[in-house]
């Protein structure tokens, strides 16, 4: 073989190899909780497995818990936007005032206690009110968790007055507004900081879901767990599962279609359902540990809901001052919730 022929052959082989391997994509997704908690167990890992299976192995999704790739939970959105990671789990509330329209879904007694139903509402609401806010990333799913529960040292909450003076961790601005209105001292912090804050006495307890209680060792760090009566959650929290926009748009069409097939309403409800599954497990584990499991009376729940309504009105006024139509946002969130009730 002449040198020129050899070079041409080698170049052709190289081009073929490059073309072949160019179709293989590894996506690094990051989150900030234990891999044993509900969302990674029942949504993230099955979602990653589905992507790999449907692509015949051409897409591999690697999941990194506990922010192992760097950064912190509050700046996860920016890590995705800037390409430091390919994708991840974002709680917009961890950056207060940056995504204010998302807070409508987090207001007191806004959603049902079904994470799946609430997540369907979240996806619908997101399409109308939040896609411009998230234009710098590619949103795969928008979802909520199950009902927020009050976990604390000492006896369970029985009356509204029992909140007075308690130092309670809150995950979002609406949640901390509610805790303050109830008489507690709210301390905002991301979930990874909660166990240490409990163990050091920085907080007396906090509000979070049942499903997070095992991985946070709340069976050891708290004594009681209190929910409100009825079908509506005390509060909820909004999440997105998102990709770097350039990474998504740079994928071959057929592989991007696989991401699309596992996105949207289906993926959002899947993520919410993961929290429902985890909530049942977490509640049972707290009960098995001997902790006190309590539900407020309907009368006390009504008193707390009345305080929650005042918080919602205060939020509407704040949004109006920022140039939004706060009442319209609340009405839209309520409509999305009502439209997605499954019963």
Task: Annotate each predicted stretch with a short phrase.
Residues 1, 22-23:
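Absolute protein N-terminus
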Residues 16-22:
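Sec/Tat signal peptide C-region and signal peptidase I cleavage site
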């Amino acid at each position: 073989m002449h040198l020129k022929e050899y070079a041409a052959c080698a170049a052709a082989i190289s081009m073929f190899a490059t073309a072949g391997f160019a179709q293989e994509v590894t996506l690094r997704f990051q989150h900030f909780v234990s891999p044993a908690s509900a969302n990674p167990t029942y949504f993230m890992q099955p979602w990653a497995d589905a992507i790999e299976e449907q692509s015949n192995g051409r897409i591999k999704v690697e999941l990194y818990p506990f922010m192992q790739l760097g950064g912190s939970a509050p700046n996860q959105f920016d890590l995705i936007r800037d390409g430091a990671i390919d994708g991840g789990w974002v709680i917009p509330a961890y950056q207060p005032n940056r995504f204010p329209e998302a807070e409508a879904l987090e207001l007191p007694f806004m959603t049902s206690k079904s994470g799946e139903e609430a997540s369907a509402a979240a996806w619908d609401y997101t399409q109308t009110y939040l896609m411009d806010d998230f234009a710098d990333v590619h949103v795969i799913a928008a979802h909520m968790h199950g009902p927020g529960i009050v976990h604390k040292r000492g006896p369970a909450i029985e009356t509204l007055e029992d909140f007075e003076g308690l130092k309670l961790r809150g995950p979002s601005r609406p949640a901390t507004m509610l805790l303050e209105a109830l008489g507690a001292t709210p301390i905002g912090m991301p979930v990874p900081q909660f166990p240490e804050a409990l163990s050091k006495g920085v907080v007396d307890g906090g509000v979070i879901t049942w499903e997070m209680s095992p991985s946070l060792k709340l069976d050891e760090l708290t004594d009681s767990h209190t929910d409100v009566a009825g079908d509506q959650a005390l509060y909820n929290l909004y999440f997105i599962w998102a990709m770097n926009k350039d990474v998504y748009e740079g994928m071959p069409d057929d592989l991007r279609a696989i991401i699309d097939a596992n996105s949207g309403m289906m993926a959002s409800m899947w993520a919410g359902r993961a929290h429902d599954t985890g909530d049942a497990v977490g509640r049972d584990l707290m009960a098995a540990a001997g902790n006190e499991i309590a539900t407020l009376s309907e009368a006390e729940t009504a008193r707390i809901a009345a305080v929650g309504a005042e918080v919602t009105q205060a939020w509407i006024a704040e949004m109006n001052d920022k140039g939004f139509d706060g009442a319209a946002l609340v009405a839209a969130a309520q409509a999305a919730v009502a439209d997605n009730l499954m019963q």
